[in-house]
Protein backbone atom coordinates (compact mmCIF):
# COMPACT_ATOMS: atom_id res chain seq x y z
CA UNK A 1 0.00 0.00 0.00
CA UNK A 2 2.80 2.34 0.97
CA UNK A 3 4.57 1.52 -2.29
CA UNK A 4 1.41 2.40 -4.28
CA UNK A 5 1.04 5.72 -2.47
CA UNK A 6 4.66 6.61 -3.23
CA UNK A 7 4.11 5.64 -6.88
CA UNK A 8 1.03 7.87 -7.16
CA UNK A 9 2.87 10.73 -5.48
CA UNK A 10 5.75 10.40 -7.94
CA UNK A 11 3.31 10.53 -10.87
CA UNK A 12 1.66 13.61 -9.39
CA UNK A 13 5.00 15.36 -8.97
CA UNK A 14 5.97 14.44 -12.53
CA UNK A 15 2.72 15.79 -13.93
CA UNK A 16 3.04 18.98 -11.90
CA UNK A 17 6.60 19.45 -13.16
CA UNK A 18 5.59 18.87 -16.76
CA UNK A 19 2.70 21.30 -16.54
CA UNK A 20 4.94 23.90 -14.93
CA UNK A 21 7.65 23.47 -17.55
CA UNK A 22 5.17 24.03 -20.38
CA UNK A 23 3.28 26.87 -18.75
CA UNK A 24 5.39 29.47 -20.56
CA UNK A 25 4.99 27.79 -23.96
CA UNK A 26 1.97 29.85 -25.13
CA UNK A 27 3.74 33.08 -24.19
CA UNK A 28 6.88 31.94 -25.99
CA UNK A 29 4.88 31.05 -29.08
CA UNK A 30 3.21 34.47 -28.95
CA UNK A 31 6.60 36.21 -28.82
CA UNK A 32 7.81 34.05 -31.70
CA UNK A 33 4.78 34.74 -33.88
CA UNK A 34 4.97 38.49 -33.21
CA UNK A 35 8.70 38.47 -33.86
CA UNK A 36 8.33 36.70 -37.18
CA UNK A 37 5.53 39.01 -38.29
CA UNK A 38 7.53 42.11 -37.37
CA UNK A 39 10.57 40.61 -39.11
CA UNK A 40 8.58 40.06 -42.30
CA UNK A 41 7.50 43.71 -42.20
CA UNK A 42 11.04 44.99 -41.71
CA UNK A 43 10.48 46.30 -38.18
CA UNK A 44 13.90 45.18 -37.05
CA UNK A 45 14.06 46.73 -33.56
CA UNK A 46 10.65 45.44 -32.49
CA UNK A 47 11.30 42.08 -34.13
CA UNK A 48 14.58 41.67 -32.26
CA UNK A 49 12.87 42.36 -28.93
CA UNK A 50 10.18 39.72 -29.54
CA UNK A 51 12.66 37.17 -30.90
CA UNK A 52 14.96 37.59 -27.90
CA UNK A 53 11.97 36.95 -25.64
CA UNK A 54 11.06 33.89 -27.72
CA UNK A 55 14.60 32.55 -27.47
CA UNK A 56 14.59 32.88 -23.69
CA UNK A 57 11.59 30.58 -23.46
CA UNK A 58 12.39 28.26 -26.36
CA UNK A 59 12.98 24.56 -25.79
CA UNK A 60 16.76 24.03 -25.82
CA UNK A 61 16.23 20.70 -27.58
CA UNK A 62 14.25 22.30 -30.42
CA UNK A 63 17.29 22.98 -32.57
CA UNK A 64 15.31 23.93 -35.67
CA UNK A 65 13.35 26.68 -33.90
CA UNK A 66 16.52 27.97 -32.22
CA UNK A 67 18.25 28.06 -35.59
CA UNK A 68 15.41 30.05 -37.15
CA UNK A 69 15.38 32.51 -34.25
CA UNK A 70 19.16 32.94 -34.34
CA UNK A 71 19.04 33.52 -38.09
CA UNK A 72 16.41 36.23 -37.75
CA UNK A 73 18.29 37.84 -34.86
CA UNK A 74 21.44 37.94 -37.00
CA UNK A 75 19.53 39.59 -39.85
CA UNK A 76 18.07 42.14 -37.42
CA UNK A 77 21.58 42.94 -36.21
CA UNK A 78 22.76 43.41 -39.79
CA UNK A 79 19.81 45.59 -40.74
CA UNK A 80 20.26 47.73 -37.64
CA UNK A 81 24.01 48.03 -38.16
CA UNK A 82 24.70 46.61 -34.71
CA UNK A 83 28.31 46.44 -33.60
CA UNK A 84 27.96 42.77 -32.77
CA UNK A 85 26.46 41.85 -36.15
CA UNK A 86 29.64 40.30 -37.55
CA UNK A 87 30.25 38.38 -34.32
CA UNK A 88 26.69 37.05 -34.48
CA UNK A 89 27.26 35.88 -38.05
CA UNK A 90 30.46 34.10 -37.09
CA UNK A 91 28.72 32.49 -34.12
CA UNK A 92 25.79 31.39 -36.28
CA UNK A 93 28.09 29.80 -38.88
CA UNK A 94 30.01 28.00 -36.13
CA UNK A 95 26.87 26.81 -34.36
CA UNK A 96 24.99 25.79 -37.52
CA UNK A 97 27.67 25.08 -40.17
CA UNK A 98 25.25 23.23 -42.47
CA UNK A 99 22.38 25.72 -42.14
CA UNK A 100 20.49 26.73 -45.27
CA UNK A 101 20.46 30.26 -43.85
CA UNK A 102 24.23 30.78 -44.13
CA UNK A 103 24.00 31.78 -47.79
CA UNK A 104 21.36 34.44 -47.08
CA UNK A 105 23.42 35.77 -44.17
CA UNK A 106 26.54 36.13 -46.31
CA UNK A 107 24.43 37.99 -48.86
CA UNK A 108 22.93 40.25 -46.18
CA UNK A 109 26.40 40.98 -44.84
CA UNK A 110 27.52 41.96 -48.34
CA UNK A 111 24.62 44.41 -48.57
CA UNK A 112 25.62 45.88 -45.22
CA UNK A 113 29.17 46.47 -46.42
CA UNK A 114 27.82 48.11 -49.57
CA UNK A 115 25.73 50.48 -47.48
CA UNK A 116 28.93 51.43 -45.63
CA UNK A 117 30.85 51.85 -48.91
CA UNK A 118 33.20 49.04 -47.80
CA UNK A 119 33.24 47.53 -51.26
CA UNK A 120 36.27 45.25 -50.89
CA UNK A 121 34.59 43.54 -47.93
CA UNK A 122 31.31 43.41 -49.85
CA UNK A 123 33.06 41.79 -52.80
CA UNK A 124 34.57 39.16 -50.52
CA UNK A 125 31.14 38.37 -49.04
CA UNK A 126 29.41 38.19 -52.39
CA UNK A 127 32.20 35.93 -53.63
CA UNK A 128 31.08 33.33 -51.07
CA UNK A 129 27.40 33.60 -51.99
CA UNK A 130 25.73 30.83 -53.97
CA UNK A 131 23.96 32.97 -56.58
CA UNK A 132 21.69 30.16 -57.77
CA UNK A 133 20.38 29.59 -54.25
CA UNK A 134 19.10 33.18 -53.97
CA UNK A 135 15.50 34.03 -54.78
CA UNK A 136 14.71 36.28 -57.75
CA UNK A 137 14.68 39.55 -55.80
CA UNK A 138 17.96 38.79 -54.06
CA UNK A 139 19.56 37.83 -57.36
CA UNK A 140 18.62 41.21 -58.78
CA UNK A 141 19.99 42.95 -55.69
CA UNK A 142 23.17 40.91 -56.05
CA UNK A 143 23.53 41.84 -59.73
CA UNK A 144 22.92 45.52 -59.02
CA UNK A 145 25.45 45.66 -56.18
CA UNK A 146 28.07 43.65 -58.04
CA UNK A 147 27.53 45.77 -61.14
CA UNK A 148 28.00 48.93 -59.09
CA UNK A 149 31.17 47.58 -57.45
CA UNK A 150 32.68 46.75 -60.85
CA UNK A 151 31.51 50.12 -62.19
CA UNK A 152 33.37 51.81 -59.34
CA UNK A 153 36.48 49.83 -60.27
CA UNK A 154 36.16 51.11 -63.87
CA UNK A 155 35.62 47.58 -65.14
CA UNK A 156 32.71 48.49 -67.38
CA UNK A 157 32.63 45.15 -69.19
CA UNK A 158 32.12 43.18 -65.99
CA UNK A 159 29.67 45.78 -64.71
CA UNK A 160 27.57 45.38 -67.85
CA UNK A 161 27.38 41.60 -67.42
CA UNK A 162 25.68 42.14 -64.06
CA UNK A 163 23.43 45.02 -65.12
CA UNK A 164 22.29 43.10 -68.21
CA UNK A 165 20.90 40.32 -66.03
CA UNK A 166 18.34 42.62 -64.39
CA UNK A 167 14.90 42.22 -65.94
CA UNK A 168 13.17 45.34 -67.37
CA UNK A 169 10.19 44.54 -65.11
CA UNK A 170 12.37 44.60 -62.01
CA UNK A 171 12.06 47.31 -59.38
CA UNK A 172 15.83 47.71 -59.73
CA UNK A 173 15.83 48.13 -63.50
CA UNK A 174 16.01 51.95 -63.54
CA UNK A 175 19.22 51.80 -61.52
CA UNK A 176 20.75 49.27 -63.89
CA UNK A 177 19.59 51.25 -66.93
CA UNK A 178 21.16 54.44 -65.58
CA UNK A 179 24.59 52.84 -65.21
CA UNK A 180 24.31 51.10 -68.58
CA UNK A 181 23.39 54.42 -70.20
CA UNK A 182 26.26 56.19 -68.46
CA UNK A 183 28.70 53.50 -69.63
CA UNK A 184 27.44 53.96 -73.20
CA UNK A 185 27.85 57.73 -72.80
CA UNK A 186 31.42 57.32 -71.49
CA UNK A 187 32.22 55.06 -74.46
CA UNK A 188 30.77 57.62 -76.87
CA UNK A 189 28.01 55.24 -77.87
CA UNK A 190 25.65 58.17 -77.97
CA UNK A 191 22.68 56.60 -79.76
CA UNK A 192 22.50 53.83 -77.18
CA UNK A 193 23.04 56.29 -74.34
CA UNK A 194 20.30 58.59 -75.67
CA UNK A 195 17.83 55.73 -75.83
CA UNK A 196 18.55 54.80 -72.23
CA UNK A 197 18.37 58.32 -70.82
CA UNK A 198 15.14 59.01 -72.72
CA UNK A 199 13.58 56.02 -71.00
CA UNK A 200 14.78 57.41 -67.67
CA UNK A 201 12.98 60.73 -68.13
CA UNK A 202 9.96 59.23 -66.37
CA UNK A 203 12.05 57.60 -63.67
CA UNK A 204 11.45 58.77 -60.13
CA UNK A 205 15.10 58.23 -59.27
CA UNK A 206 16.75 59.58 -62.43
CA UNK A 207 14.13 61.79 -64.09
CA UNK A 208 15.92 64.97 -63.04
CA UNK A 209 19.44 63.96 -64.10
CA UNK A 210 18.53 62.34 -67.45
CA UNK A 211 17.95 65.70 -69.28
CA UNK A 212 21.51 66.77 -68.42
CA UNK A 213 22.99 63.78 -70.24
CA UNK A 214 20.59 64.14 -73.15
CA UNK A 215 21.70 67.76 -73.53
CA UNK A 216 25.35 66.72 -73.38
CA UNK A 217 24.76 64.09 -76.05
CA UNK A 218 23.18 66.66 -78.36
CA UNK A 219 26.12 68.98 -77.80
CA UNK A 220 28.72 66.28 -78.47
CA UNK A 221 26.93 65.31 -81.68
CA UNK A 222 26.87 68.94 -82.82
CA UNK A 223 23.11 69.30 -82.52
CA UNK A 224 23.01 72.88 -81.24
Predicted regions and their residues:
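Acidic, polar-rich low-complexity tracts and alpha-helical solenoid repeat scaffolds
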Residues: 2-7, 18-224
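Hydrophobic helical h-region of N-terminal Sec-dependent signal peptides
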Residues: 9-15
